[in-house]
């Protein structure tokens, strides 16, 4: 089957560590005997998934499917959780660890959203000499990321490099930053997270006229110190799935 769809040789072959012998050894023997070529260049054998420090199995009644998990969490959170440990190490699934993964992913997404917001409202277009010097410092994060991925697909350390970039971006940008500088930081963050399949560059949802009107009305209410009305509008928007965040640079919003 693999020969039919992938050819006589495979770049990467993955599977559970319990399949090394005899399953994968038999695949190698059959394929290389038939084709006279190396079957797979790289083998990636993952360790097992445990549930609350116990082996996941139907007999123990702790078996969880991806579909069941998706009812509680966005599957991007599950991806982040699985990438947070080296694939050759056992991974423990628990509600606490999933919440930690959710918070970690939100931290990255929020950084990306903030860079987009600042860029959209930036008064200056071109990078300053100081910003250029700052951006050069991000080369270290890229080097750390690439070093981790080249070290047997060490996604845990790669994510650590992404968090270093997030911390840098949060600490070295503000409303005075140029659009070019903010754009470069955003593009770099997207470039690294794309490698991991993490989608931080979410397309902005277009607000319909009613919601736009409510946001404008809330701003007017705040200006008039009618905070009760402003809070009521915020609650109304939340019911529509719109979360508002008041910042010094203006109002930011995102889908709940």
Question: What is each of the regions a protein language model found here?
Answer:
Residues 55-56, 62-256:
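Structural preference for alpha-helix termini/caps and helix-kink/transition segments
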Residues 1-72, 78:
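Catalytic cores of enzymes that engage adenine nucleotides and/or redox cofactors via long glycine-rich
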